[in-house]
Structures are given as structure tokens and as C-alpha cells.
Amino acid sequence: MVLEGSEPKIWRQISVPGNMTLADLERIIQAAMGWTNSHLHQFTIEGQVYGVPDDEWIDEIPSLPDDEFTLDAVLGKEVKSFSYEYDFGDGWQHEVEVKMVMIADEMLNGWPMCLAGANACPPEDVGGLGGYEEFLEAIQDPLHEDHDSMRRWCGGPFDPKGFDVNSANRDIRRWLLEAE
């Protein structure tokens, strides 16, 4: 999956079973990307929206509950990509490309995992792509007027090229253990 509009590209390759619900996929995406699952989300697959129905965020297309549909059920054999939006305020759009559909027994290690990726996920509530660009300008320039406040806000140094697949997999495993 690719975080749309990011340059350089922020992307992750994950492996998940086809019998996983969209709600569970959402948690795997969160862990792999580095998001904290602090905001609403939705998937749009073949024009149908799936998510957590919320009266405040009613769209023209009614949302179906993402915990009631598996990947197998919504993807079939024809769907090769779909979108995932996280944080409707910041509007993080992800394009998810389907490489292959596997059953759990065929998966490496038998559990969902992040296989590869590049570049750090933007901090939560940074303000979308525009806010992220401003954040990067401030954090990378010690003379920038907002440098110190942005470092404090994000909790210290931030490496936009930083991505650790092992850390992503620890987060995925942690969520899987909590979900059991």
C-alpha cells in the first residue's frame, strides 16, 4: 500500500489471509504504517464503502460495517486495488494493491506480517500532506522558528526516511495477541 501524495513514497507490503475481516485488516495496516488507530477510517472497494458507521460522517454512499466482511468476500478474483482512508480530518488516503490472495496455511509464518516498506509514517494529527510538509521543513532546519516546538510536539527527533520492518511486525504481533 502507498500513502497517496507522499514524496518520497511512504509504502508498506503486508501479507494477510483472505479470511481476515476488513476491521482486522485495518488494524494490521495501522500497525504496519505506524498509525495509532486514533481516528475513523473507511475502505472503498468497487464503489462500496466499508468502515465503522458513524452518524457524524455520513457520506453519499452508506458505509457497511467492516467487521462483517472478509477480504475474500469483498475482493473476489477481479479486484486488484482499493482505497483505505484514515483520519477524515487529515485525509490520509492509501492505495492498496492486491498482489495475490492466499489462505492462512500458505502464509509465511502463518500470521499477518509486514514484508517490506520505506519511509516513516507522518505523525498523527500533523494536518495532512500540507501539514506534514510544513512539519518536515521545521524539524529538519534547526534555525526554523518552529523547530523546537515541533520536536517537542512529536516527542523528539524524527527521521522521515526511518522505517523498521521488525518494529512494524512487533506492533502487528502485539495487536494480534491483544485481539485473541
Predicted feature locations:
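Short linear regulatory motifs enriched in tryptophan with gly/pro/ser
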Residues: 1-180
